[in-house]
Amino acid sequence: FAQWQVGSATFLVDRDGRVIGPAARGDAFVLVRENRAGALNPGDSVPAEAVRAAVALSELLPPQWQPPGDAFDYAPDTGISVAMRNGWRVRFGDDEELAWKVATFQALAAEIARTGARVQLVDVRFPGRPYYR
């Protein structure tokens, strides 16, 4: 299970993206925030690959790279991303090849630290074509 937030409302969803109902305050599930207006009702669907990606990333990312409040962000055009504590935004996209994406991100983070580059965005959505700026 995970939580899916749209606007100020938060819903409990299953791994297939089906909305179960309103989330209870204090639920300890991974949170996915979608920045759009609208409402969800039980039985509606959200992108299952985004739910699965956020849950998997909460397990794959080492503690220093976990997002504050276990909150992952979702946008239809970029998929799942994480606002890191150091100010970087890291785009992971969908739930495909997440172990590779995390390993690639960690290698890029080490390279960024080594060179002292100033970074705002790291994108590992596409195997073989990661980048940062």
Predicted regions and their residues:
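Charged, solvent-exposed interaction patches on well-folded alpha/beta domains
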Residues: 1-133
